Amino acid sequence: MNIRPLHDRVIVKRSEVESKSAGGIVLTGSAAEQSTRGEVLAVGNGRILENGSVQPLDVKVGDMVIFNEGYGVKKEKIDGEEVLILSESDLMAVVS
């Protein structure tokens, strides 16, 4: 995948979630939750501040993150893979 996000944008590949209930029933459709965790695939150069300087991002390629899937999150298919394009501010935590 050859993609370079701009500014404070981050490309994330959503992690797979277990699609079975605690009782072993396979969940489909709206019953199956989508994960809000994923792996960072690419990061932009950073946020441009009012004084023109660039503030580097806190996340790096390979980080596992928890994100808020809100209004500003864009879903795209790149090389047949669904990825999310979001601002660093939509990330809530880095999982170690």
From Swiss-Prot:
GO terms for biological process: chaperone cofactor-dependent protein refolding. GO terms for molecular function: ATP binding; metal ion binding; protein folding chaperone; protein-folding chaperone binding; unfolded protein binding. Pfam families: Cpn10. GO terms for cellular component: cytoplasm. Keywords: Chaperone, Cytoplasm. Gene3D superfamilies: GroES chaperonin (2.30.33.40). The keyword Transcription does not apply. Its main location: cytoplasm. It is found in: Cytoplasm. The keyword Ion transport does not apply. PROSITE patterns: CHAPERONINS_CPN10. Belongs to the GroES chaperonin family. Heptamer of 7 subunits arranged in a ring. Interacts with the chaperonin GroEL. Together with the chaperonin GroEL, plays an essential role in assisting protein folding. The GroEL-GroES system forms a nano-cage that allows encapsulation of the non-native substrate proteins and provides a physical environment optimized to promote and accelerate protein folding. GroES binds to the apical surface of the GroEL ring, thereby capping the opening of the GroEL channel. This is Co-chaperonin GroES. It comes from Shewanella woodyi (strain ATCC 51908 / MS32). The lineage of its organism: Bacteria, Pseudomonadati, Pseudomonadota, Gammaproteobacteria, Alteromonadales.
